[in-house]
């Protein structure tokens, strides 16, 4: 049986040109919902077989919410969405792994659930506290099977609400090489109430909205409005870079995720690099080698992704784990700047491939990072 799909663009095109620059109306970027059961079944089978989700757990402060939210996330991915899942858990020092306790330290184990979904648990260790998410996601890539065609990296505290999420994700990855798998994101409070709404970076970019951060020394987190003072249609704070990102496998075969952000901001760097503006995602006084790593990733992305960066329709829910003011998204840059963090000499990779801090070289940097992680107060239920 063959299917004919109506063009989704007003000039008769059925796909987006990679050199397309003028903004498109939001409605033209909305993927249609197909109701043919054979189509849905075929796309769902493709998602089940060819799409893998990778997440990571690193919890040196031993926050309880990290584990409870992960278990909720795992149930959502494997039981509700019925997608394959790779979890990379990094334990600190000689502590036991909390989620993959049945494995040897240097081993990975494949589990096949009753519904046919596969999960892979990977155990690694480190002895210093740095931001590891992108680093652990890259380690998870080593475990994906050869027939995997699409990879979704996701924080272990989100919930995808679209009823046909996997189908829509794969459809979007036919059009774009990289996507943020949501249009809007809702931050939830401790009682499940919505306390904030965001629009994804991919959504804003795909709809022609220009990211224009104010010149400052705070990492490019403040965005100016355009000349007409209008933002993307709808509501929500624009250009959110976080929560999740999905790639075609062919992209990840040529480039992996950027690991330079030892206090976070890796997602921010990568989203801005995908649109060729990574210089504006970091303070101007950042160490030259930090800037060099980001620019190198941007150059590689320009060659491989070539601006093909979009989004998936739908909303994700972001579970509460402490007030966002404690993340200090802007002021944490002071730790990096004051200690002149150099990614070429201040960190190394251990035998597991996990980033370690050269702790004795810069003890002030070591102590400041430890203080930062403790000050996040992720088990607190205070919203403000």
Go through the PLM ranges and name each one.
Residues 89-148:
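Active-site-proximal specificity loops/subdomain of glycosyltransferases
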Residues 97-101, 165-166, 190-195, 322-324, ...:
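Short aromatic-enriched loop/helix-cap "lid" or pocket-rim segments at secondary-structure transitions
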Residues 159-277, 292, 297:
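Conserved catalytic core of nucleotide-sugar-dependent glycosyltransferases
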Residues 57-62, 69-81, 88-108, 158:
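A conserved acidic beta->alpha catalytic loop
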Residues 2-49, 59-69, 73, 261-384:
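C-terminal catalytic/acceptor-binding lobe
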Residues 148-161:
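Short beta-strand-to-loop acidic/aromatic patch adjacent to the donor-nucleotide binding site
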Residues 88, 179-184, 312, 319:
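Short glycine/serine/threonine-enriched helix-capping/active-site loop
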Residues 48-52, 75-88, 117-118, 149:
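Short loop->beta transition adjacent to catalytic acidic/histidine clusters or analogous donor-positioning motifs
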């Amino acid at each position: 049986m063959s299917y004919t799909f109506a063009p989704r663009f007003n000039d008769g095109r059925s796909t987006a040109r990679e050199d397309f620059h003028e903004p498109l109306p939001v409605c033209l970027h909305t993927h249609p919902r197909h109701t043919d059961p054979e189509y849905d079944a075929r796309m769902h089978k493709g998602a089940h077989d060819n799409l893998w989700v990778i997440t990571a757990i690193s919890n040196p402060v031993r926050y309880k919410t990290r584990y409870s939210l992960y278990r909720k996330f795992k149930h959502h991915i494997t039981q509700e969405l019925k997608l394959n899942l790779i979890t990379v858990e990094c334990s600190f020092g000689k502590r036991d792994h909390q989620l993959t306790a049945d494995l040897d330290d240097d081993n990975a184990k494949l589990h096949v659930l009753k519904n046919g979904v596969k999960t892979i648990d990977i155990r690694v260790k480190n002895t210093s506290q740095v931001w590891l998410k992108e680093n652990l996601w890259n380690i998870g890539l080593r475990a994906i099977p050869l027939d995997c065609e699409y990879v979704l990296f996701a924080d272990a505290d989100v919930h995808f609400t679209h009823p046909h999420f996997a189908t829509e994700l794969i459809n979007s990855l036919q059009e774009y090489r990289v996507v943020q798998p949501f249009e809007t994101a809702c931050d939830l409070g401790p009682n499940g109430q919505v306390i904030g709404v965001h629009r994804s970076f991919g959504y804003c970019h795909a709809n022609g909205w220009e990211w224009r951060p104010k010149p400052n020394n705070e990492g490019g987190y403040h965005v100016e409005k355009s000349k007409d003072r209008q933002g993307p249609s709808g509501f929500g704070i624009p250009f959110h870079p976080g929560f999740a990102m999905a790639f075609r496998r062919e992209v990840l075969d040529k480039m992996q995720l950027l690991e330079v952000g030892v206090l976070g901001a890796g997602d921010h760097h990568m989203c801005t690099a995908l649109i060729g503006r990574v210089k504006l995602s970091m303070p101007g006084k950042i160490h030259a080698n930090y800037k060099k790593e980001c620019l190198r990733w941007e150059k590689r992305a320009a060659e491989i992704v070539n601006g093909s960066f979009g989004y998936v329709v739908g909303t994700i829910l972001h579970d509460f784990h402490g007030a966002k003011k404690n993340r200090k998204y802007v002021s944490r840059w002071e730790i990096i700047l004051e200690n002149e963090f150099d990614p070429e000499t201040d960190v190394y990779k251990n035998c597991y491939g996990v980033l370690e801090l050269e702790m004795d070289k810069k003890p002030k940097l070591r102590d400041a990072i430890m203080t930062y992680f403790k000050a996040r107060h992720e088990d607190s239920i205070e919203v403000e």
